[in-house]
Curated annotation (Swiss-Prot):
This is Glucose-6-phosphate isomerase 2. It catalyses: alpha-D-glucose 6-phosphate = beta-D-fructose 6-phosphate. It comes from Chromobacterium violaceum (strain ATCC 12472 / DSM 30191 / JCM 1249 / CCUG 213 / NBRC 12614 / NCIMB 9131 / NCTC 9757 / MK). Catalyzes the reversible isomerization of glucose-6-phosphate to fructose-6-phosphate. Disulfide bonds: none annotated.
Length: 550
């Protein structure tokens, strides 16, 4: 287990200095910062392999960043980065290494974990995935009727669903033209039923993605999919239409899946970081092995940038520290993600899971209570639509909401000047949120009004501005740039967890509700005695029974 390196970060001198700095600068307006420094964009932006980070539209000065870098050093961020990279067991509550970065290593790389080269294991699994995916994509993998596969249904939940779904959606321009990939996660039966009603059992392949092969939601969907399939074929045909991403060979075999078609991964890969592993099989089936390798290469490029760059030229570190500035010192509490790309519309949900499951913690690594704000609420929506939904609150509401704008500069689907319109809207929003509109500017607009009408309308049209944002501009959404983008947010979340003193790699909060659900399930059918819950839960159980005649 990793040595316990404990620092009461909120008792440090730099923590106090950051609070003092926030109080001294909280009324500073970004409009003034830009007016005083015409080179602000050049000084507060950086680029890596076609990915530009503009963090100039933030309530930060060079002094702010100096203090935040001091905070990172005080938290021993570089040490924690090195410990993660080398395979030390930094997931202390589960006594595990955290090595999703190893999944992105190039061929021939070496990473020894307790005397064993895990990079070689990774590439052995990749080779098997490559062989299988090429059989399916080239029409050589045939179903029970001798036809090639036309639809792939991924059955998973959490990290076994959302990461692959986001990557496959974003990279639809690279998808096989005759192979559709579907994702089913919800235990609500309509999710699976509405997917299957459009499919042909003879040309459908199911991926059951569950490391333990015991995840209740996934197994319920897998059993339902199996029953649907058996209406058209015999049990002997299951092996042609079901594969598993799992490490539980006996359970996989009992289901009817050939263990030769079981693809494993390791306990040092957390679910929300697993798209880079065999969990990414649906992505590989969609875009092909070479493109999937480019996706891994993009992630690896961000890894190298993260581990090797100084803090002041390090995208994940900068995003993380600026996020801490708002969340912990401004107590902003939320952070919005707006991708201006339809293919990235589910990216906010992925980042939401990644961030909130990792850093939604009230205790530190040693179990000590934390008396400062940690993980923010992450939310968002694709950009153009969100402008007509919640941007009103961003512009004229009472809350500070830091935002990330994600903008591909080129589209795979150019229609007239529509992409120019999209880009113009994105850039306009970042400027409007920063600048606002002051009284003099509104008065010029309303120069034709006077008296009560002017007095009434003037305050309605004021925009305070000073709402912070980062802009991440990609040349184009490609497998490589998507890999960089997803790895960027992984590392950002890790940095924030280190500074807050959190173990970002467990998720005990997910378990309690599952325990209670197992208790409540038999009570819904009336097969138990007295209910032992609070009056609300007991009342809801009885209400359900009444509606179902139980």
């Amino acid at each position: 287990m990793a040595a316990q390196r404990h620092i009461d970060i909120n008792s440090t001198q730099v923590w106090a200095k950051l609070h003092q700095h926030q109080r001294a600068t909280r009324h500073m307006h970004m409009r003034e910062l830009f007016e005083l420094d015409p080179q602000r964009f050049q000084r507060f932006s950086l680029e890596l392999d076609g990915l530009l980070l503009d963090y100039s539209k933030n309530r930060v000065t060079e002094r702010t960043l100096e203090l935040l870098f001091d905070l990172a050093r005080k938290a021993d961020l570089r040490g924690w980065m090195d410990r993660m990279r080398s395979g030390e067991r930094i997931n202390v509550s589960e006594n595990r290494s955290v090595l999703h970065t190893a999944l992105r290593l190039p061929a021939g790389a070496r990473l020894d974990l307790e005397g064993h080269n895990v990079a070689a294991d990774v590439h052995q699994v990749l080779a098997r995935l490559k062989d299988f995916s090429e059989q399916v994509r080239e029409g050589r993998w045939l179903g029970f009727a001798g036809q090639p596969i036309r639809d792939v249904v991924n059955l998973g939940i959490g990290g076994s669903d959302l990461g692959p779904l986001v990557a496959a959606d974003a990279l639809a321009a690279y998808a096989h033209p005759d192979l559709k990939v579907h994702f089913v996660s919800n235990v609500d039966g309509q999710h699976l039923a509405r997917t299957l009603e459009r499919l042909n059992p003879a040309t459908t392949l199911f991926i059951v993605a569950s490391k333990s092969f015991t995840t209740p939601e996934t197994l319920l969907n897998a059993q339902a999919a199996r029953a649907w399939f058996l209406q058209a074929a015999g049990e002997a045909q299951i092996a042609k239409h079901f594969v598993a991403v799992s490490t539980n060979e006996p359970a996989v075999r009992a289901f009817g899946i050939d263990p030769q078609h079981m693809f494993g991964f390791w306990d040092w890969v957390g679910g929300r970081y697993s798209v880079w592993s065999a969990i990414g099989l649906p992505v590989m089936l969609s875009i092909g092995y070479d493109n999937f390798r480019a996706f891994l290469d993009g992630g690896h490029a961000m890894d190298r940038h993260f581990f090797e760059s100084p803090f002041d030229a390090n995208m994940p570190v900068l995003l993380a520290l600026i996020g801490i500035w708002y969340n912990t010192f401004y107590r902003a509490h939320t952070h919005a993600i707006m991708p201006y790309d339809h293919g990235l519309r589910r990216l906010p949900a992925h980042i939401q899971q990644l961030d909130m499951e990792s850093n939604g913690k009230r205790v530190g690594r040693l179990g000590e209570a934390l008396d400062f704000d940690t993980g923010p609420v992450i939310w968002g929506e694709e950009g153009a639509n969100s402008q007509h939904a919640f941007f009103q609150l961003l512009h004229q509401g009472t809350r500070l909401v830091p935002c990330d704008f994600i903008l591909p500069l080129n589209s795979h689907y150019p229609l007239g000047n529509q992409h120019d319109v999209l880009v113009a809207n994105c850039l306009a929003q970042t400027e409007a949120l920063m600048r606002g509109k002051n009284e003099a500017e509104v008065m010029r607009e309303l120069s034709h009004l006077s008296g009560e009408q002017l007095d009434m309308l003037l305050p309605q049209k004021l925009f305070p501005g000073n709402q912070p944002s980062n802009t991440l501009a990609l040349d184009r959404v490609t497998p490589y740039s998507m890999g960089m983008l997803m790895a960027l947010y992984e590392h950002k979340v890790f940095v924030q967890g280190v500074i807050w003193g959190i173990n970002s790699f467990d998720q005990w909060g997910v378990e309690y509700g599952k325990q209670l659900a197992r208790r409540i399930l038999p009570e819904l059918s009336g097969d138990t005695g007295a209910l032992g819950h609070d009056s609300s839960t007991n009342g809801l159980i009885r209400h359900y029974r009444e509606r179902h005649g139980k």
